[in-house]
Swiss-Prot record:
Record protein name field: Galectin-1
Binding site residues for a beta-D-galactoside: H45, F46, N47, P48, R49, H53, N62, W69, G70, A71, E72
Modified residues (N6-acetyllysine): K13, K29, K108, K128
Function: Lectin that binds beta-galactoside and a wide array of complex carbohydrates. Plays a role in regulating apoptosis, cell proliferation and cell differentiation. Inhibits CD45 protein phosphatase activity and therefore the dephosphorylation of Lyn kinase. Strong inducer of T-cell apoptosis.
Assigned GO CC terms: cytoplasm; extracellular space
SMART domains linked: Gal-bind_lectin, GLECT
Residues recorded as bearing N6-succinyllysine in the entry: K108
Pfam families reported for this sequence: Gal-bind_lectin
Domain of life the protein comes from: Eukaryota
Main localization category: secreted
An annotated GO BP: apoptotic process
UniProt keyword Acetylation present: yes
Sequence positions bearing N-acetylalanine: A2
Length: 135
């Protein structure tokens, strides 16, 4: 998946929220948001799949520790629409990350790396970022 935005030295602390808003491509197959320490140490790989890798309208989440992927977690809540604007809010603490989807639905993903700060963000695929905010 081609990488678009990459940001480092974010110093996002527990309890703070990262809000990402962007445009989903009209012909979207999938996109991803990655958060963590760096590209090889991700506490969250957030990957909405419209029709990719055998998944249809499914959000796949994972982590990467030292370059090794963990076990995938799938969410069937899928409020994303091709050709629309979408916003995702992500916050975290020592035990898990909370992902709030555009329709208000929230789910949790374990903080497997036990990160105390998130310093890295990357985005790729069929999603054009318009705004990144820290709250």
């Amino acid at each position: 998946m081609a990488c678009g935005l990459v940001a480092s030295n974010l110093n996002l602390k527990p309890g703070e929220c990262l809000r990402v808003r962007g445009e989903v491509a009209a012909d979207a197959k999938s996109f991803s948001l990655n958060l963590g320490k760096d590209d090889n140490n991700l506490c969250l790989h957030f990957n909405p799949r419209f029709n990719a890798h055998g998944d249809i309208n499914t959000i796949v989440c994972n982590s990467k520790d030292g370059g090794a992927w963990g076990a995938e977690q799938r969410e069937t809540a899928f409020p994303f629409q091709p050709g629309s604007v979408a916003e995702v809010c992500i916050s975290f603490n020592q035990t898990d990350l909370t992902i709030k989807l555009p329709d208000g639905y929230e789910f949790k993903f374990p903080n497997r790396l036990n990160l105390e700060a998130i310093n890295y963000l990357s985005a790729g695929g069929d999603f054009k970022i318009k705004c990144v905010a820290f709250e």
